[in-house]
């Protein structure tokens, strides 16, 4: 998904020019941040807001300091959206290594109690991109065992896949798609 129109606003995806091919660890995040900040500075005059394209909210603080437009992170946006209409939500992400960071972010914004289940599908980002059916199978296999009122896919590659396929529930559990959460929050800030 390279661009999309949401109402009268236009959403465009810009890729960094260098850095890791996918973000699957803290080390990948650290290597990607300088490239993200550089990209935001380069395009600041062209856009009214930026959405971090990785679910981890990588580089959000650094990017906010570097530009004057709003910078929205999918973790916080999706946690906030889920908390608005449910008392408990779960997060299903790509691997177990990233779970502590999401737990910490939920605590930072006061939603740790509502984030009742954190799980990993153990699916590399590259698999989501190159073999989406296999990735969806792995996601569903874990989701079916989760006991939550709503579920957040904790990877933007999953979010794009769900958007492209019109998926709004998995295993009978409603999905809060971080892609849509971040877009709507960004829109509300630039009206």
Task: Show which residues each predicted segment covers.
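Conserved beta-strand elements of the Class I
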Residues: 89-92, 152
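Glycine-rich, highly charged phosphate/nucleotide-binding loops
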Residues: 25-45, 132-142
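Short, acidic/small-residue loops that bind anionic groups at enzyme active sites
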Residues: 64-85, 167-186
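Hydrophobic alpha-helical
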Residues: 49-52, 56-60, 142-171, 182-186
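N-terminal active-site wall of soluble small-molecule enzyme domains
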Residues: 20-39, 53-63
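N-terminal glycine-rich anion-binding loop in soluble enzyme alpha/beta folds
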Residues: 1-34, 93-132
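General beta-strand structural signal in soluble alpha/beta enzymes
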Residues: 13-14, 52, 71-74, 152-153, ...
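A structural micro-motif
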Residues: 8-9, 69, 87, 113-116, ...
């Amino acid at each position: 998904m390279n661009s999309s129109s949401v109402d009268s606003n236009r959403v465009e995806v810009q890729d960094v020019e260098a850095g890791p091919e996918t973000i699957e660890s803290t080390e990948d995040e650290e290597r990607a941040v300088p490239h993200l900040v550089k990209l935001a500075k380069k395009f600041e005059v062209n856009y009214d807001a930026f959405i971090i394209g990785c679910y981890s909210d990588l580089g959000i603080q650094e990017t906010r300091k570097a530009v004057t437009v709003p910078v929205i992170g999918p973790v916080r946006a999706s946690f906030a959206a889920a908390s608005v209409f449910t008392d408990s939500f779960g997060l299903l992400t790509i691997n177990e290594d990233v779970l502590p960071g999401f737990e910490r972010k939920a605590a930072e914004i006061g939603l740790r109690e509502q984030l009742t289940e954190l799980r990993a599908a153990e699916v590399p980002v590259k698999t989501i991109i190159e073999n989406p059916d296999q990735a969806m199978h792995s996601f569903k296999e874990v989701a079916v065992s989760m006991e939550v009122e709503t579920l957040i896919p904790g990877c933007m590659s999953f979010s794009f896949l769900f958007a492209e396929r019109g998926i709004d529930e998995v295993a009978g559990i409603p999905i809060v798609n971080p892609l849509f959460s971040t877009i709507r929050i960004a829109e509300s800030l630039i009206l």
